[in-house]
A protein has these predicted regions:
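N-terminal structured subdomain of primase-like DNA metabolism proteins
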Residues: 1-88
Length: 88
């Protein structure tokens, strides 16, 4: 898998495959409890049309590659792509 292929993967589908379910959906945005930290109220939003996420609790966001870096705690793109391919 390369970066362009990874960026085509739906973040919503990816999170669902990882066992995360959205708490609500509003205006095409999917709200989750953050996969990056513990929280009670959903503040992690995914815009599936733009292939972007944003975590209001830590004021960070990006595409699936950036999410993979955070979830797998690495900046190594090869590792991130391998893990995304495995988990999607």
């Amino acid at each position: 898998m390369d970066i362009s292929e990874a960026k085509k993967i739906s973040i919503v589908d990816y999170l669902e495959n990882m066992g995360y379910t959205h708490a609500k959906m509003r205006r095409g945005q999917y709200w989750y409890r953050s996969p990056l930290r513990e929280e009670k109220t959903p503040s992690f939003v995914v815009n599936n049309n733009l292939h972007e996420w944003y975590d209001f609790g830590i004021a960070e966001g990006g595409d699936l590659i950036e999410l993979g870096k955070r979830m797998y705690n690495t900046n190594d793109i090869h590792t991130v792509l391998t893990m995304i391919e495995r988990d999607s």
